[in-house]
Amino acid sequence: MAVRGEAAQDWAKPGLRGPSPAPVARGDHRCRGGSPSSPRGSGCCWRALALQPLRRSPQLSSALCAGSLSVLLALLVRLVGGEVGGELESSQEAAAEEEEEEGARGGVFPGPRGGAPGGGAQLSPWLQPAALLFSLLCAFFWMGLCLLRAGVRLPLAVALLAACCAGEALVQLSLGVGDGRLLSLPAAGVLLSCLGGATWLVLRLRLGVLMVALTSALRTVALVSLERFKVAWRPYLAYLAAVLGLLLARYAEQLLPQCSGPAPPRERFGSQSSARTKEEIPGWKRRRRSSSVVAGEMSGCGGKSHRRTSLPCIPREQLMGHSEWDHKRGSRGSQSGTSVTVDIAVMGEAHGLITDLLADPSLPPNVCTSLRAVSNLLSTQLTFQAIHKPRVNPTVTFSENYTCSDSEEGLEKDKLAIPKRLRRSLPPGLLRRVSSTWTTTTSATGLPTLEPAPVRRDRSASIKPHEAPSPSAVNPDSWNAPVLMTLTKSRSFTSSYAVSAANHVKAKKQNRPGGLDKISPVPSPSSSPPQGSPTSSPVSGIASVQFPESPEVTTKRGPGSHRALTYTQSAPDLSPQIPPSPVICSSCGRPYSQGNPADGPSERSGPAMQKPNRTDDTSQVTSDYETNNNSDSSDILQNDEEAECQREPLRKASACGTYTPQTMIFLDKPILAPEPLVMDNLDSIMDQLNTWNFPIFDLVENIGRKCGRILSQVSYRLFEDMGLFEAFKIPVREFMNYFHALEIGYRDIPYHNRIHATDVLHAVWYLTTQPIPGLPSVIGDHGSASDSDSDSGFTHGHMGYVFSKAYHVPDDKYGCLSGNIPALELMALYVAAAMHDYDHPGRTNAFLVATSAPQAVLYNDRSVLENHHAAAAWNLFMSRPEYNFLVNLDHVEFKHFRFLVIEAILATDLKKHFDFVAKFNAKVNDDVGIDWTNENDRLLVCQMCIKLADINGPAKCKDLHLRWTEGIASEFYEQGDEEASLGLPISPFMDRSAPQLANLQESFISHIVGPLCHSYDSAGLMPGKWVDDSDDSGDTDDPEEEEEEAETPHEEETCENSEAPRKKSFKRRRIYCQITQHLLQNHMMWKKVIEEEQCLSGTENQAPDQAPLQHSSEQIQAIKEEEEEKGKPRAEETLAPQPDL
């Protein structure tokens, strides 16, 4: 029947009528051409119209089949009943007696009332219950088929029947309902309650009603009709038939083809089997990058697309030059006839997994050696595959301007797509990344948490200064043009500045004051709260009692001072003689002029820009700040071109949309440093700068109400001590102007204020200038260095090494970081420390994201504060010519300097803390270790240095540590109060009514500061001093704190000739480190406070949530040097806690 119906259905379709058209034509002629009175023609048409809905609707056809089968079964039951009723009357009494006897014992009756005698009637007693059970099976078959096609899985349907069996057992056993009362209302109510509750959990309303109604009806039929069985058995037989029917439905659903009609709501995307497969098998999808530029290039290739379907459409020509690719195909692919394609992303993931395994200290040495060898092989392949980009022509100078096109930004980003994916996958987290979660930490508590991994691609931040045409065609005032900030349609946030030809290199001071044009789409941290922020938000300004402002500073700030997120250059006036604001390309985000096409190129042919680019650079930083949100700068690519502005502005004007500034803010005058520039009454305290526990709060008290100048004064002393003013020809007045404006931009909040910025600046200066035991130096003496840096390509005429005037090398067994880090990178680290918390609102990143602050929206909830600090500080620097203290840096050096500063600021995001620590540990534990000639390694060291300086409070002496702890606690409590006022859940450790200061500090030291100090100290970068055995005789009994020193080429005990005998083979050398000593002492102090609080509260057992803290506490006490492998330049150990020296 089904085959015939399907054939009829196919025959009814227009396109499936078969090859013989003659019969069809005759049929059509009869239906159309027949007379209306012809009964044969009219009957044919009416039959076709009546069967057409049945053919097209699977529901109607299924209902018709179920109905016909039910009618047949009913007729069969009727025939069985008639046969039984026509039996001989003589056997009724015997059958009745036998029925009563069997009914009393329980079991199957041998025959019905009036059973027929003889052998011919022996099958009739079994025919009626078999027919009834078959009917129940068929009914559940159709119901199961309906449920399966609706998306219900077979185990769920069987579970519903199990719920029915449980209800029956509850009715019969627990409630004690007799056989005669199974159809009573209480029994039916209990059973329907069980079934309905189970159905409500797994089925939708329509399917649930169908299931309950049909099951209850069939149970009633079974209780009434199955007279051959005991009453208590009848429901279970019905459920058994139901299970068989569901199994048959599952089997039939797999065999029968799916209907071509519209599928149910859960099946409209495919067949039932495919849907169940998708539900049972989780789908792991790779994040893909779509680009209109890449799509356009791929569409224009015209050849076969050699790529995996799960990877982005990036042609090989983007990964390496055309000539290199043709050469590789000629040398390799021509030999075998096929080209070997390597999946770079998979190799990157494998390299990351191996690096993660290497971080495990419990691995055997042979396993570590094998894994390290595989990691080196993968690193070579990754470098070979991913960083094949055309080199810059050494004869091309950076003074040339390139054409600004629509696709320039997209091409540059697509070329960096693969390395960005590698940078995102290579650094493993300190805690293993499992499934779709990653480890992170909140900046508030320092406790590690788990967050869902982001599903969006990381956005890059690119801020690009731009040179306008020459002064011969434009206004010669290089700082008159306004700063324009816009959001481009590319994947990065571009802040384009319209600056004239001699931007920061030949900046001139303006001659007359005037209005200041400005567009500021970002809220200002001035006295008025920004849009979208509550009135009580710290963005509206928090007056601090501890650090009052002087009237002089308050007067200079004014009601509309430049404490905004974006700053602009002042213009003399708004007269018509001034050229109009440059137009910004809406495609690439770069400004271009609409002036005369005959305007000459910008004047960039000075001596500073004449030197050619090095051709032997292995790794050169990108010309712009182009990095992912992970702030992982290990894979800095060689820059293939300087993306300058267009040389002919009007040639591409028709192809670029325009963006016109909408908002203008007028500022009167910049904030300048007051006289005298250098305060002369601070020498007594400034002489203590070379101590780790610098009395910074005493300095605040000495400055008094002028404490707003603390950052500029300390910055001047440190720069002057390092000789940076002479090395880079920094003008003192511009330097003091900018740093004074920078310190004014810090808000008066308890912790993240200008005093904290000064403390971090002093900490990075101390860590980079103090003697470090056993640290090898790149240069032999002060000032002697090679002609050029092997990695960056900068000559040491401007990139030499500087040392502190207070640095005195005791002997050749000490070194310092300033002897291994070039001066430009060192100055970038100091400037980043001063900028790193500029305009901090006193709230955490999590709070800004939770309240949908404008900064969180602007930076896509990623490193919100860190991006804001860097952008606002650089915007301040570029806003006025009076702030340009880098006037003598050439264009390449300035871009490199800016890149380093931004990377260092973004590294202070504690959410990426574990990634940095794990990456640094992997670098230190590598065979090569830290390569001081590699710019990437030096940048990683600088990032770790500023991270340690940013959280150095627990590593200070007790008095300073308690002062900083009081400040951070006050700031946390203010955020907790605001969260409570906004109806938000109060963050951990921020509830003023339930202070947990000791737990906060103990956990912060255990999870954040301790591992960071341990990693930094294990790399041999922590300042300290050698201690002889005679100086620590009381502490040498502990064997765990003693290690034998390995052979190093710089030790006195090792002879120059490796074959010559040495005076001493081993000598136990120990190091005293004041920083780690303070850290251990403060950690023990907070542990004792926690124990005392627990004793006072009557808690003898430690809380469950502090068990991991205790484990970390024990680990943090072991901050000592590991035994170095052969060939390492340092092998020592750290002293146990001792009294201060």
From Swiss-Prot:
Binding site for Mn(2+): H756, H836, D837, D950
InterPro entries named in the record: HD/PDEase_dom, PDEase_catalytic_dom, PDEase_catalytic_dom_sf, PDEase_CS
Record's compositionally biased regions (Acidic residues): 1029-1046
UniProt xrefs under SMART domains: HDc
Composition skew (Polar residues), residue ranges: 618-637, 1098-1113
A GO cellular component annotation in the UniProt record: cytosol
TM segment ranges: 62-82, 127-147, 157-177, 182-202, 207-227, 229-249
Membrane topology: Multi-pass membrane protein
GO molecular function terms attached to this record: 3',5'-cGMP-inhibited cyclic-nucleotide phosphodiesterase activity; 3',5'-cyclic-AMP phosphodiesterase activity; 3',5'-cyclic-GMP phosphodiesterase activity; 3',5'-cyclic-nucleotide phosphodiesterase activity; cyclic-nucleotide phosphodiesterase activity; estrogen binding; metal ion binding; nuclear estrogen receptor activity
Subcellular location(s) per record: Membrane; Cytoplasm, Cytosol
Top-level taxon in the UniProt lineage: Eukaryota
Keywords: cAMP, cGMP, Cytoplasm, Hydrolase, Isopeptide bond, Magnesium, Manganese, Membrane, Metal-binding, Phosphoprotein, Transmembrane, Transmembrane helix, Ubl conjugation
Region annotation (Interaction with SLFN12) ranges: 669-1141
GO biological process terms on file: apoptotic signaling pathway; cAMP-mediated signaling; cellular response to cGMP; cellular response to transforming growth factor beta stimulus; cGMP-mediated signaling; negative regulation of adenylate cyclase-activating G protein-coupled receptor signaling pathway; negative regulation of apoptotic process; negative regulation of cAMP/PKA signal transduction
Cysteines joined through disulfide linkages: none
Compositionally skewed regions (Pro residues) per UniProt: 522-532
Region annotation Disordered: where it falls in the sequence: 1-41, 89-111, 262-309, 433-479, 504-643, 1024-1062, 1098-1141
Cofactor(s) this protein cannot do without: Mn(2+); Mg(2+)
Domain PDEase per the UniProt entry, residue ranges: 674-1093
Phosphoserine PTM sites in chain numbering: S310, S492, S520, S524, S533, S1033
Bias-annotated ranges (Low complexity): 433-445
Function, as annotated: Cyclic nucleotide phosphodiesterase with specificity for the second messengers cAMP and cGMP, which are key regulators of many important physiological processes. Also has activity toward cUMP. Independently of its catalytic activity it is part of an E2/17beta-estradiol-induced pro-apoptotic signaling pathway. E2 stabilizes the PDE3A/SLFN12 complex in the cytosol, promoting the dephosphorylation of SLFN12 and activating its pro-apoptotic ribosomal RNA/rRNA ribonuclease activity.
Subunit structure: Homodimer. Interacts with PDE3A; direct low affinity interaction which is stimulated by binding of 17beta-estradiol/E2 to PDE3A and that positively regulates the ribonuclease activity of SLFN12.
Protein name: cGMP-inhibited 3',5'-cyclic phosphodiesterase 3A
